[in-house]
Amino acid sequence: MVLLKKGFAILAASFLAIGLAACSSSKNPASSDGKKVLTVSVEETYKEYIESIKTKFEKENDVTVKIVEKQMFEQLEALPLDGPAGNAPDVMLAAYDRIGGLGQQGHLLDIKPSNTKSFGDKEMQQVTVDGKVYGMPLVIETLILYYNKDLLKTAPKTFKDLEKLTEDPRFAFASEKGKSTGFLAKWTDFYMSYGLLAGYGGYVFGKNGTDSGDIGLNNKGAVEAVKYAEKWFETYWPKGMQDNSSADDFIQQMFLEGKAAAIIGGPWSAANYKEAKLNYGAAPIPTLPNGEEYAPFAGGKGWVASKYTKEPELAEKWLEYAANDANAYAFYEDTNEVPANTAARKKADEQKNELTSAVIKQYETATPTPNIPEMAEVWTGAESLIFDAASGKKSTQTSANDAVNVIKENIKEKYVK
């Protein structure tokens, strides 16, 4: 872990060195003209966008905005040490599922935004923990269906349509008789398969993802979903699809080579398909056999402020400024990442971009990823849920029960209520 590798070295650093650190927010540094300085941490790819919006903020607030380039997750992992040491930026971007833990641990500034009307309940839920708001939503993400337009005239609408692809000789897998690569999904990955489980009535935590004592990954619906996944692994897919370590590479290869007509993936994959000059389409994931919609995790990222900032008012102003209608849409124009801001999202949808529209439509059925710290135990505890059943290692119910028991035991061991 990055935090452990840093050890006590940062804590042992002299306060003089800390005070001179370029990105320090603990000493309330001033620019050469005497103005206050607000440090904004973003990845290199977002620097140009921040440059384009910071001037107006600087003029309106008589402040200098300094940009610090750092990978988002590295910045978040460093915050618990860098913050107290005075080396953290004032504001930064954070994945929604990291906000809860950092907020509860006291590393993020809880804010009282003056206007949340530009966001829906689903968006605000992802930046709120225990009734406290720790950020402003910027981007929404969820899984969608990609399909090859050279192979399919229209996007499949139902999973029955996807099953029909297995009968198409174009997608027969030469190495294994009777197997097909017509439709592929990395269901051994819990992030990818959760939409299937949720579509059948499974859930991670009760009370909108806040009750870690109520886990619904082994209820009747979840087990039914796993049984349906087993059908794909046993009847349709090559055996290699059970290998969680290599399945994604296999899926991407098949799709890029035109041997898979449709796959489930995230919006971040589109750049690779575009670069490969693949004639791809994007659409919502087809309706499940039970008539319900696939309900993948809803995620994304938002603006947050360090609890250690010496400019909390300015930091909060930046969070609202950077997430407002105009700037949220400008971010979309620059990055093609779908806005959390509802006005900006509507404008983005009007551009008739297929990928954008697919994400927006799928997001309607998506479930916010629980942002409480206990979610970390779900990722590890549920990773073998589908594999154990699909490989025949365990029965469907036993596989689900064992996964839930592992999650419960880990939560009991690591988290005290």
From Swiss-Prot:
Ranges in a coiled coil: none
Taxonomy, superkingdom: Bacteria
Entry's Gene Ontology BP terms: maltodextrin transmembrane transport; maltose transport
GO MF annotation terms: carbohydrate transmembrane transporter activity; maltose binding
Activity regulation text: Inhibited by glucose and lactose.
Short name of any one Pfam family annotated for the protein: SBP_bac_1
Keyword Cell membrane: yes
InterPro entries found in the cross-reference section: Maltose/Cyclodextrin-bd (IPR006060), SBP (IPR006059)
Keyword Metal-binding: no
Keywords, alphabetical: Cell membrane, Lipoprotein, Membrane, Palmitate, Polysaccharide transport, Signal, Sugar transport, Transport
GO cellular component: ATP-binding cassette (ABC) transporter complex, substrate-binding subunit-containing
SUPFAM superfamilies tied to this protein: Periplasmic binding protein-like II (SSF53850)
Gene3D superfamilies to which the protein is assigned, alphabetical: Periplasmic binding protein-like II (3.40.190.10)
Chain residues carrying a lipid of type N-palmitoyl cysteine: C23
Annotated compartments: Cell membrane
S-diacylglycerol cysteine: lipidated positions: C23
Induction (UniProt): Induced by maltose and repressed by glucose.
Cleavable signal peptide: 1-22
Subunit structure: The complex is composed of two ATP-binding proteins (MsmX), two transmembrane proteins (MdxF and MdxG) and a solute-binding protein (MdxE).
Cited function: Part of the ABC transporter complex involved in maltodextrin import. Binds maltodextrin. Can also bind maltose with low affinity, but is not involved in its uptake.
Miscellaneous remark of the record: Maltodextrin can also be transported inside the cell after degradation to maltose by extracellular amylase AmyE, transported as maltose by MalP.
Family as reported in the entry's similarity comment: Belongs to the bacterial solute-binding protein 1 family.
Protein name in the entry: Maltodextrin-binding protein MdxE
Organism: Bacillus subtilis (strain 168)
Gene: mdxE
